[in-house]
């Protein structure tokens, strides 16, 4: 049996100044997944990002951290997907989510972009919203005028711990997600 998911994308912004910001929660997840799978990232200019190939029992899975900045993430996702003939429904995008309390997780196929610029660009470049999303809750600052500053700043120690716990829990669901057991993964991820 082959993997249902052939590419896992972590969203974030490149550069040291953004490494520890909330908007990079997708990168944090991908770094942990690569470590778990013993896969190493290397810069791939033709894919506009850092790419790692994980060789798993049921087939290869590509890991991608776009280096295009968040609002152009679709350029990297589309380039890798087209080159390796990966369909949108074989892609899992992991990203920060303002509309979910800090430390909570949501998993789904398709849907809107919720104002997330990375998702907007991915949808535009793929021509569809029918890809999987793993949404890591970072909480909301309470005022939409504070959103940009909020996502581009470091979380408090307590919030970082909650996000790290969400990343750890999400990693436990990856085998089910890869195997196409999405109901099981959803039940596990959505539980407290």
From Swiss-Prot:
InterPro entries: Pept_tRNA_hydro (IPR001328), Pept_tRNA_hydro_CS (IPR018171), Pept_tRNA_hydro_sf (IPR036416). Keywords: Cytoplasm, Hydrolase, RNA-binding, tRNA-binding. One of its GO terms (cellular component) is cytoplasm. It is found in: Cytoplasm. The active site is at residue 23. The keyword Hydrolase applies. It catalyses: an N-acyl-L-alpha-aminoacyl-tRNA + H2O = an N-acyl-L-amino acid + a tRNA + H(+). GO terms for biological process: protein quality control for misfolded or incompletely synthesized proteins; rescue of stalled ribosome. The record marks 13 as: Discriminates between blocked and unblocked aminoacyl-tRNA. Its EC number is 3.1.1.29. Its main location: cytoplasm. Pfam families: Pept_tRNA_hydro. GO terms for molecular function: peptidyl-tRNA hydrolase activity; tRNA binding. TRNA binds at residues 18, 69, 71, 117. The record marks 96 as: Stabilizes the basic form of H active site to accept a proton. Monomer. NCBIfam families: pth. Belongs to the PTH family. Hydrolyzes ribosome-free peptidyl-tRNAs (with 1 or more amino acids incorporated), which drop off the ribosome during protein synthesis, or as a result of ribosome stalling. Catalyzes the release of premature peptidyl moieties from peptidyl-tRNA molecules trapped in stalled 50S ribosomal subunits, and thus maintains levels of free tRNAs and 50S ribosomes. PANTHER family: PEPTIDYL-TRNA HYDROLASE. This is Peptidyl-tRNA hydrolase. It comes from Neisseria meningitidis serogroup A / serotype 4A (strain DSM 15465 / Z2491). The lineage of its organism: Bacteria, Pseudomonadati, Pseudomonadota, Betaproteobacteria, Neisseriales.
């Amino acid at each position: 049996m082959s993997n249902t998911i052939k590419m896992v994308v972590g969203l974030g912004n490149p550069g040291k100044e953004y490494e520890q910001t909330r908007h990079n929660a997708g990168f944090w997840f991908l770094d942990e997944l690569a470590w778990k799978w013993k896969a190493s990232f290397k810069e791939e200019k033709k894919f506009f990002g850092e790419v790692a190939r994980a060789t798993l029992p049921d087939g290869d899975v590509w890991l991608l951290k776009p280096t295009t900045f968040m609002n152009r993430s679709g350029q990297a996702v589309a380039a890798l997907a087209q080159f390796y003939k990966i369909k949108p429904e074989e892609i899992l995008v992991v990203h920060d989510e303002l509309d979910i309390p800090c430390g909570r997780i949501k998993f789904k196929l398709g849907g809107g972009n919720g104002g997330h610029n990375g998702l907007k660009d991915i949808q535009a470049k793929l021509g569809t919203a029918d890809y999987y999303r793993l949404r890591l809750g970072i909480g909301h600052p309470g005022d939409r005028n504070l959103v940009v500053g909020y996502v581009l700043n470091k979380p408090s120690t307590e919030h970082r711990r909650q996000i790290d716990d969400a990343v750890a829990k999400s990693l436990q669901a990856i085998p089910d997600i890869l195997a196409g057991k999405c109901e099981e993964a959803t039940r596990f991820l959505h539980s407290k």
